[in-house]
Amino acid sequence: MSSEEGKLFVGGLNFNTDERALEDHFSSFGPISEVVVVKDRETQRSRGFGFITFTNPEHASNAMRAMNGESLDGRQIRVDHAGKSARGSRGGAFGSYERGRGYPRGGGDQGYGSGRYDNRPGAYGFGYGYGYGRSRDYGGRSQGGYDRYSGGNYRDNYDN
């Protein structure tokens, strides 16, 4: 049995929910081998999601069914099996919301500069489909196309 089988993704966490609170809310379903609340690398603040690994996959399934959609520290949480997405078949920039949101196996915070979502050189990899680059690549538009909805150039009013 792989530990991945008993691993759950927990999303929508209150930013003040820590590992101990998460474990307290899930421990009634069975023995837990690991609890991780993913934190921002620079600020050490919660990113609003985490992972819980049960020693028995059946306990994890029971916890998922019981806790998905429940309230924890004032926030409705989403609980799903972790790492279920097929890496090559994620749809769109967000991945598949129903299959673990495409977070990589092993969890952990790869940070904004990891290129996890956008493999182009110079891109920051925010994961939202914008792909802001370090040079003149602004989501596939040139610098002149600052506001695609206005139809104008952001320098129009200043360079005349």
From Swiss-Prot:
InterPro entries: Nucleotide-bd_a/b_plait_sf (IPR012677), RBD_domain_sf (IPR035979), RBM (IPR050441), RBM3/CIRBP_RRM (IPR034278), RRM_dom (IPR000504). GO terms for cellular component: cytoplasm; dendrite; nucleoplasm; nucleus. Residues 103-114 have a biased composition (Gly residues). Its main location: nucleus. Residues 81-116, 135-160 are annotated as: Disordered. It is found in: Nucleus; Cytoplasm; Cell projection, Dendrite. SUPFAM superfamilies: RNA-binding domain, RBD. One of its GO terms (biological process) is cold acclimation. It comes from the Eukaryota. The modification Omega-N-methylarginine is found at R47, R105, R120, R134. Cold-inducible mRNA binding protein that enhances global protein synthesis at both physiological and mild hypothermic temperatures. Reduces the relative abundance of microRNAs, when overexpressed. Enhances phosphorylation of translation initiation factors and active polysome formation. This is RNA-binding protein 3. It comes from Capra hircus.
